[in-house]
Amino acid sequence: TFDKFAGSSQAARAYCELDIVYEDPDIIIINKPAGMLSQPADDGEPSLVEYLTGYLLKKGDLTEEQLKTFRPSVCNRLDRNTSGMVCAGKSLAGLQFLSRIFHDRTLHKYYICLTKGKIEKPDHIRGYLHKDKKTNKVIVSRQEFKDSLPIETKYRPLGSNGKITLLEVELITGRTHQIRAHLAGTGHPLLGDTKYGDSEFNKQYIRHGVRHQLLHAYRLVIPETDQNFVAPAPELFCKIIKEENLEEAYHENLERNMGLRKNDHHSSSDRNACE
């Protein structure tokens, strides 16, 4: 259900089962499924913000009275069809902490994706990005140009079968469509990406149900608090990994990052999705 309260100052809320990776009195980290908006849109479709509000109200961590002066908010936005971890503040202190570590880049964000072709070596690529608001697409260049912003992306291949590569990406800057456009610019677009990808390559995977980019925000590291958060890949991602004989590379990387220590946390719902 979705309660929007049109024409009212009351906060909208919606209800669904959320995959909680981590939660304390101030912050919450949610494993967002592909297809869900991170933040409210103009058309009124419920987003993770409304689902979070509903979750906290139902749980009793938030009251209608508190909502008059504070509303929970997400601190990092994923594209609708990108899955993975989104951080949100449950309190003003939580929002301030998350905003600071995102701004200072003392929180490290890692993604996994499937890309066209064989990538053999790790790389640290830089460039400039400009968003065309009319088309909602970005342009990436190695040279600075008018109204462009600097971007930085690091990646390392986890495995490849020659046709497709399982890639880990560390997002240094967090611009709109950065990973998708930056990798496409290197000749290795994301599998399933209808905006920046290779349409002929994508067509080969439609029969498997791939209709969006296979990009998943799977790991967050906060050195300041010695915390490591992991959200294993969703079912469709794992299905393609298995089809392409990349399971071993995926599991080796996951086990390396999920050698859980005292302050480490991981998502529960997809923990065994690739088994």
Which residue ranges define each predicted feature?
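Conserved beta/loop motifs at nucleotide-recognition and modification sites
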Residues: 1-45, 50, 122-128
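Residue-level signal for inorganic ion chemistry
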Residues: 31-32, 87, 113, 155, ...
